[in-house]
Each structure stands twice: as C-alpha cells, then as structure tokens.
Design a protein with these regions (language model features):
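Small-residue-rich hydrophobic transmembrane alpha-helices
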Residues: 49-109, 146-165, 271-335, 367-389, ...
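Short runs within selected transmembrane alpha-helices of multi-pass transporters and secretion channels
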Residues: 70, 139-157, 165-173, 194-209, ...
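Helix-terminus/linker motif at the lipid-water interface of multi-pass membrane proteins
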Residues: 31-50, 119-126, 182-189, 250-277, ...
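Residue-level hotspots within pore-lining transmembrane alpha-helices
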Residues: 24, 28, 32, 62-66, ...
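N-terminal transmembrane alpha-helices
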Residues: 6-44, 60-72, 76, 80, ...
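Short alpha-helical transmembrane segments in multi-pass integral membrane proteins
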Residues: 1-19, 77-142, 188-240, 297-363, ...
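Transmembrane helical elements of multi-pass membrane transporters/channels
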Residues: 17-36, 138, 172, 201-205, ...
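Structural signal for membrane-spanning alpha-helices in multi-pass inner-membrane proteins
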Residues: 111, 154, 180, 184, ...
Length: 442
C-alpha cells in the first residue's frame, strides 16, 4: 500500500483514503452482534433475543477496553510522531499490549468467579438465564480477542495501514456469518453456536491484523525495553472519553432493560434488542467516519497544521450527518421491515415495535455529529471537553429523560430518551466547537 504523508497529502484525498477501510473495520463489532441477533431471533425466538440483550453491556465493555488502549495510545503516538519524537511507536504500542493482557485476565477472573451475580444484576431472569449461560461459555475465554481486535485496529490505522485493519474485519466478519449459519442450523448448537462463531471470527480477525507486524512498512514494535508504566496513565487519559462512550452505552442498555421490564415486560427488551442492534450498526458507521479523520487530525495537530484540521472536521461532520439522515429516513419508511429482519412479532407487539423504531431512529440525525465531535476533541488532545460530551449524551440526559418522561406521558416516553438527549447535545457540541476553533491555544 502506498505510504502517504498525512501532513502534506490533499485533505479530501487523505480522508477518502482512510474512510472506507475505517468504516469497514469498525463494522466488526456490529457484524458479530448483528448476525448473532438475527440468527438467534429467527432460529430460537424472542426470549433468547432478550437474553442476548442482557449480555450486551459486558461485550461492549470488552470492545470498549480495546478502544481505550488502542485509540488512547495511537492518538498520543501520532501526535508524538507529528512532533518527530523518537521511539513513539514502541513506547505506546508496548504499553497498550501489556495493559490489554492484564485487563483481559481481570475480566475473565470476575466473570468466572462471579458469573451468576453479575448476570442477575444485569437483568437476567429465570426465563433468560439458561440462554445467557450458553452464550457466555465461549465469550469468557475469548475476552482477549474482543479487546485486541479493536486495539490493534486503532494502532494499524495510525501506522498507515487502514486496509489491513479492514481486511481483518472482513475476514472475521464473513467467517462469523458462515459459521453462525452452520452452527445454528445444520448443527443446531443454539446460543452456544452463535457465540462460538463470533469468537472464532474474532480470532481470525486478530490473526489477520497481526500480519501487519511482518510487513515491510510496519513501524509498530513490541519491546519490553520500551515499556514505560508511567505512560499507562497518559494512554488511559487520552482514550477514556471513547471508553466512557462504551461504558455509557452499556449503562444505558441496563437502564433501558429496567424500564422496559417495568412498562412492557420481556417483549419490551426484545423490541429494544432490535433497536439497539440497528443502532450499533449506525454507531459503527459513525465511529468509522470519526476514526478515518482521527490519524489525519492527530498528525496535523502535532505538526501544527491547523487549517488542514479544520478541513478534515468539515468533511467528517457532513459525512456523519448524511449517514445519520439515511438511518432516520429508513426508520420512518420501513420500521416493520427492520423489525421482521430479527424476529417475528404478533400484531400488537409489531405495533409497539414500529412506534419505537420511528421515534428512536430520529436520534441518528444528531448522533453522528455528536460522536464525530467527541472524537475530534480527543484527537486535538482536549479529552475533558470530549468527556463532557460523552457523559451528557450517554448517561446524564438519556438517563434522566428515560425515568422522567414515562412517568409523565406513559411507556411511549421511553423511546424519546435518546433522540432528545442527542438533540440537546448537538447544541453543546456547537458551543464546544466554537471554543476549540482556536486550537493553537492547546
């Protein structure tokens, strides 16, 4: 692959060079979970789909940990390279790898020792717990691959290898789809088979990503001599906003499950599983746009080329709005088709699902711009502003509206929580952008 100079290449050309590989690479999370959801909903049924939604939070935390270390470390690496600092790749990559191994072991220990209490806390019931146990059997030993798939992708994008990151996602995703069908239909392996297919796909994904380390243009080197534990705090600080996004999403799913059980029963969680899976696809696209801009923004920030950063910002925001509008329109035009992809519902349940999809999908019109703004602020080393956006849109506003509005207007109010939170956050994002326009101030 041609090795381009991100500080000199025309901005639009550099952005497009990263866009499709970044989008396809970030789709890996949604591919694994989306395929599982469709297969489980159609093959096993609504209760199994509700069980899958219960395990979303820990799975998102695993991927989020990879983003924490990968994006956090690679942003600092790119800024350091823009300033011509020596050994930046070795220092940050080695720190991220060692941290990832340690954190994966901690997660595995917690879920092995405290599995039942954790799942009951997340909302598992007597109806769903057996499905959850079957699904999590392959997931727990596969935790390192959840973390390292997203972590290595981030470093590869910043090492000018977006196509290798894309190849890993495609190979893992396609294999996951094939194995999902084989394990669930001919072999009738149920939830265990769906989960096993996902983990095998992740193993292949990581294996393909690791081929970059043998490439001639690889500058990422693992070296214990360059391990600097003091950098761990810097990596966490840099990557925490994007990690908190995944944490916030996990918490929000948990809160939604509580409210939906209260107002709708188990079918409410099934409907939300349809929405959250489709939302995950949209968010993956938004993250892809943001991550296409991230290495260009960080490298030019380190080099002090601020006009180029503003051009990247405009391209990213416009692209995010277009993607969001497409999802919003789809939610208004074909809500029933979207629901039918995942599971067959009764007439009354489909009525509720259609209303929920139409309301919730209006959030995508604003969500893409907010996610891009959050990642943009992180790329110009303004993690506090990025963190504020994350907390406001992901936990504070959504959580407050989620509990207040249903009490005022009934159960339909649950579905307005995210659209209203995203709309208000857009206004805050505009204010923060105006504050950050003079990025020379640091």
């Amino acid at each position: 692959m041609k090795n381009i100079d991100l500080t000199k290449e025309p901005v639009r050309k550099a952005f497009m060079h990263y866009l499709i590989p970044a989008v396809l690479a970030t789709m890996v999370t949604s591919i694994y979970i989306l395929v599982d959801t469709i297969m489980i909903g159609n093959r096993i049924g609504a209760d199994a789909l509700a069980g899958l939604n219960i395990v979303f939070p820990p799975i998102m935390i695993f991927f989020g940990t990879g983003n924490l270390l990968g994006i956090g470390g690679s942003v600092l690496m790119s800024v350091a390279l823009g300033r011509n600092e020596q050994n930046a790749q070795k220092k940050y990559f080695t720190t991220a790898v060692i941290s990832g191994i340690f954190i994966a072991l901690v997660y595995m220990f917690i879920l092995i020792v405290f599995f039942n209490p954790v799942m009951r806390f997340l909302g598992a019931s007597d109806v769903t717990i057996s499905y959850i146990k079957d699904y999590m059997k392959p997931v727990i030993p596969g935790i390192p691959f959840f973390i390292f798939s997203s972590m290595i992708q981030a470093f590869l994008r910043n090492d000018k290898a977006p196509k290798t990151a894309m190849a890993g996602s495609l190979c893992g995703g396609i294999l996951n789809i094939i194995l999902d069908y084989i394990f669930m239909y001919p072999l009738n392996m149920g939830m265990f088979g769906a989960s096993l297919a996902s983990v095998i796909g992740l193993v292949v994904n990581v294996a393909v990503l690791c081929t970059h380390f043998f490439a001639r243009n690889n500058s990422l080197k693992f070296s214990l001599k360059n391990l600097q534990l003091r950098l761990f705090a810097d990596v966490i600080k840099s990557g925490f906003p994007v990690f908190l996004t995944d944490i916030a999403s996990s918490v929000l799913i948990f809160l939604f499950n509580i409210q939906l059980l209260k107002y709708y029963g188990v079918i409410g969680i099934t409907i939300y599983s349809i929405i959250s899976n489709t939302s995950l696809t949209a968010v993956s696209l938004f993250n892809g746009v943001s991550q296409a801009a991230q290495p260009i923004t960080a490298m030019n920030y380190g080099a002090g080329k601020y006009d180029r950063i503003k051009k990247v910002f405009r391209l990213g925001v416009i692209t995010s709005i277009i993607v969001g509008a497409a999802f919003t329109i789809a939610g208004f035009i074909i809500p029933e088709r979207i629901a039918n992809i995942f599971v067959k519902l009764s007439e009354s349940d489909m009525f509720n699902a259609k209303k929920a999809i139409m309301i919730y999908f209006s959030a995508f019109l604003f969500m893409g711009a907010n996610i891009f703004m959050q990642n943009y602020l992180q790329s110009i080393v303004k993690p506090l502003l990025s963190l504020i956006i994350c907390v406001i849109r992901g936990i504070v506003l959504s959580g407050i509206i989620l509990f207040i509005l249903p009490a005022l207007i009934g159960k339909i109010g649950i579905w307005f929580a995210v659209p209203l939170a995203e709309a208000v956050t857009v206004l805050i994002s505009i204010i923060f952008y105006k504050r950050s326009r003079d990025i020379k101030s640091g």
